Amino acid sequence: RLVGSEMCIRDRAPTEAEQGACLDKALEDINTASRFSERKGDVWFNRAKLIYGVAAADTTLNKEQWTVDAATEAIQKAIGEEDLPVYRQLEGDIHFYKGDFEQAFADYMKVNDSDMASSTSWYWAAKAKANIRGANFGDIIALLDSAIAKCGNPPTNEAAPYILERVDLRLKLMQYKEAVDDYDLYYDLLKGQVGDRFFYYREQAKFRMSDFPGALADIQSAIRLNPGDPTYPAEEASVYIRMENYDQALRSLENALRIAPDFASCYRLRGICYVRQGKKAEACEAFNKAKELGDPVVDKLIKEHCK
């Protein structure tokens, strides 16, 4: 065991010279262990794991034997001795760190084809795939599906970050219903212990799938949890506008402006409400206030309704 050298590396020697001696001692321990081990692959694996851990944690090291490339060489020698999934997992991690995402993906998929496949190995395969130029979002979702499936049925809390990453991909693909389903799964997983941002993000997905009652319920939950954020009553107003409830939208905008008097888009939304109510003068006054405050899209509305 490398107890002494591992503690030395972990605690960091106070001077550069002492750190160098510490690292040399660690390699000496590995070399000593190799003379007594019948599994040469494990020796190279432990060497690669130690070197990679140190090199990734301290990028200022300039010792040739303590670089990520040295870790790559060591893990490849381990695989040359015996091609084990645990070795491939580490090789994948090293390739990922170096930005060699295609190689990392190939390694993780070798792990996934073995009995060592886990939610983590599927997740990192998805992360590697996502970093490959031109990767198909559907393929990445399928990999995340496998990661989540490895978390049990129903899934454990371990699946939570994987579900949120799948939500992001579904939103990019405009799969709003599926995204909402994933948000619901996440909510159930956390037994409802979520914050205001969760309700805001789920509201956005429901809004895009035209579930306005559902969107309204979620944005109102966000307001209850964080009444000081002006974004939420402004978003509530947007929902009311889509529901053609302009009086209530105007009340929501008043609430937002009470918190943030210079919230430009609120004046634009107020103008839209007045247009829908046939109040041209009030609408143009609101649009001009939005323009004064720097709203980037109000010029088109002014040109359309106030010229």
Question: Where is each model-derived feature located?
Answer:
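Short, small-residue-biased leader/transition segments that mark boundaries at the very start
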Residues: 2-9
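Residue-level recognition of tetratricopeptide repeat
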Residues: 40, 49, 56, 84-85, 93, 116-120, 127-129, 154, ...
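Terminal, low-structured helical/coil segments at or just beyond the last alpha-helical repeat
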Residues: 276, 280-307
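Register position in tetratricopeptide repeats
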Residues: 53, 97, 131-133, 172, ...
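Structural marker of alpha-solenoid helical repeat scaffolds
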Residues: 36, 80-81, 113-115, 150-154, ...
